[in-house]
């Protein structure tokens, strides 16, 4: 009851990930059913896969609220100034073919643009490929992100891309050191996107 929903014409964060659990009360206030899509027509739009362990829902919450610590220790209202859109680009089982990553991402962006053509939005690509180390060289996926962000100079888009993950094979005490030693994952090397990495000790 303390969350004030965003206005209907508010800008959106469009999360490209494993979907989102719209039934969650903190998500439903900002995610309309028509703004929840899946790249593949036979996929469920919900974040239902055990394989991804709710990653899309977690990223949705983070995109909407950020750090909720002040709200948890207080009793004031929280006004949301942006909406949420989610497009499921990860299958519930298995993986997409790497050669399709660029196409899937472009199709997801197009779906969001078509669904609400006049809405301003930021795209959050919350998944990466942990395959070969590209050492910053462009790939078809990163090049497509660059192309979508530039938009021929007219229909430009703001893309936030995950830097990737540190392997759980390393002991926790080495985590910060490994961040300095590890390369970002594909397509975070895109030039026209903002690459974001984060850590919390909460």
Show the residue positions of the predicted features:
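Active-site core segment of subtilase-fold serine proteases
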Residues: 2-86, 113-126, 155-156
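Substrate-binding/access-modulating region of protease and related hydrolase catalytic domains
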Residues: 90-190, 200
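Short glycine-rich loop/turn motifs that provide flexible caps or phosphate-binding loops at active sites
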Residues: 55, 163, 196
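Short helix/loop capping segments that flank catalytic or ligand/cofactor-binding pockets
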Residues: 23-25, 170-171, 196-198
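Hydrophobic residues at beta-strand termini and immediately following loops
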Residues: 87-89, 196
């Amino acid at each position: 009851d303390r969350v004030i929903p965003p206005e209907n014409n508010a800008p959106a964060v469009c999360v490209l990930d494993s979907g989102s659990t719209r039934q969650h009360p903190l998500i439903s206030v900002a995610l309309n059913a028509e703004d929840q899509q899946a790249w593949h027509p036979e996929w469920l739009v919900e974040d239902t896969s055990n394989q991804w362990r709710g990653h899309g829902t977690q990223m949705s919450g983070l995109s909407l609220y950020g750090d909720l610590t002040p709200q948890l220790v207080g009793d004031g209202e929280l006004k949301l100034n942006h909406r949420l859109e989610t497009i499921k680009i990860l299958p519930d089982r298995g993986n997409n073919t790497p050669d399709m990553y660029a196409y899937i991402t472009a199709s997801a962006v197009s779906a969001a643009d078509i669904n609400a053509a006049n809405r301003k939005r930021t795209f959050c690509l919350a998944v990466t490929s942990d395959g070969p180390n590209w050492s910053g060289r462009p790939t078809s996926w990163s090049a497509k992100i660059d192309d979508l962000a530039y938009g021929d100079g007219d229909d430009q888009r703001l893309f936030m891309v995950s830097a990737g993950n540190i392997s759980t094979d390393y002991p926790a005490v080495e985590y910060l050191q490994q961040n300095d030693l590890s390369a970002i994952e594909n397509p975070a090397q895109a030039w026209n996107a903002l690459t974001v990495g984060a850590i919390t000790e909460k």
